[in-house]
């Protein structure tokens, strides 16, 4: 199917979020498939090269910021598109040989994308790294020492709430259904 979110309206979303008392939003800038929801210079596999042809990340960040809501971005360092383009198996850790920590070229690619996201979209309050964060979280803190980084300073148990308090800051990472994708 053709990706063309013609009814995308981040201003409406932000107004509803403010009315609901939401304090922060986390937008998926890049998931495991590697598709980038912003106008990146790092890859042609991005929203600009779709029928929609416009950045989705910038208007969302601006809309939520106007409503006084903190802006977070979700970023997967696992990038199936990149792995495929470089003849690597499409998989995630703990599968060996597919993480940025094992592939210097993928680490450089991820870092370039993180630099774009943390320097080109105004203040980003939270950066959610969904995967091995070593080398990436440090870059986030180098760019903005005050940014909150998951898998860096906050643990994010997935699809459950721990029975006992965790030792540090944490946030339960739950879906509204039984799966991560929309159904």
Positions of PLM-derived features:
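Mature catalytic domains of secreted/periplasmic carbohydrate-active enzymes
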Residues: 1-183
């Amino acid at each position: 199917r053709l990706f063309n979110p013609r009814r995308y309206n981040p201003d409406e979303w932000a107004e509803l979020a403010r009315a609901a008392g939401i304090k922060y939003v986390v937008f998926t800038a890049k998931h495991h498939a590697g598709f980038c929801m912003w106008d990146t210079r790092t890859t042609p596999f991005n929203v600009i090269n779709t029928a929609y042809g416009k950045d989705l990340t910038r208007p969302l960040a601006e809309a939520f910021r106007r409503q006084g809501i903190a802006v977070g971005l979700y970023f997967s360092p696992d990038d199936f598109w990149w792995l495929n383009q470089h003849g690597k198996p499409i998989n995630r850790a703990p599968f060996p040989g597919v993480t940025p920590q094992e592939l210097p070229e993928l680490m450089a690619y991820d870092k370039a994308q993180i630099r774009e996201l943390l320097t080109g979209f105004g203040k980003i309050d939270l950066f959610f790294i969904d995967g091995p964060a070593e080398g990436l979280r440090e870059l986030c803190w180098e760019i903005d020492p005050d940014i909150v980084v998951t898998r860096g300073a906050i643990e994010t148990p997935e699809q459950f709430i721990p029975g006992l308090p965790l030792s540090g800051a944490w946030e339960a990472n739950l879906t509204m259904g039984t799966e991560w994708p929309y159904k």
